């Protein structure tokens, strides 16, 4: 039986978005999937999902910066899950204005339409990067915000904008703040796919940036489960909720772990092109799961290094 709830999903063709789309369809949600328009008619990861799932959804091609397009296509939806964003940190140093246009103005367009159409739930995606390097661990939602890159700053601004619509217009906003999601379909620009791919190709050398920084990695299937739990949860309205493992690991440790699984020695070569500006490097992130456990009854299925094995 199809759910009466119809989700407008931005960023549906991406890494997390494609997994979330499949998860929602599996739970009988109606989904209208926004795919970023491009001249190649490329639908990203949606090109790889099974035909049955693809036939069950409605796909629209456009841009979150195009307000008229959004107004036309959100009319028949009552839930917005907003994943679309420019996310590459290195590129944000070169093209900060693009991040303002997409991550802030694009979010504003969606919020305005959600307000006018009285959307029943607006789920906005944040990032743990807005916290900057951990000042204490585990990091709860009250941790100071110190964005250390133009990307993080644009996401922090979008977060504040989303929450302002909750306070100003009573828009039912929930902000999900994931800590380093990883898993199948992730871009090869990300560190874990880079390490795993080079190991698979039997390379004994891996070129990486900073290797002593620590992150809290969350498997993508756990992350999409948290998104869905927010849809029907009234207690999550007006809240920002961290989604992480409460388990930190350095990039060097991931290489060592991958080396043991692949049964080959891997040497790390420092690549200056992959190193962030010194004051921009986030050295440590580790999430508190207190609020996600309390409000969403959520906890990661793939704990510790088990997600790395699956990846």
Range-by-range predicted roles:
Residues 109, 180, 186, 213-215:
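Heptad-repeat alpha-helical coiled-coil signaling segments
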Residues 43-46, 159, 193, 252, ...:
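Short, surface-exposed alpha-helical segments at coil->helix boundaries
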Residues 157, 161, 165, 194-195, ...:
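Hydrophobic alpha-helix immediately C-terminal to the catalytic Tyr-X-X-X-Lys motif of short-chain
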Residues 1-181:
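N-terminal Rossmann-like NAD(P)+-binding domain of SDR-like oxidoreductases, especially those catalyzing
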Residues 137, 188-198:
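A glycine/serine/threonine-rich, flexible loop-to-helix segment
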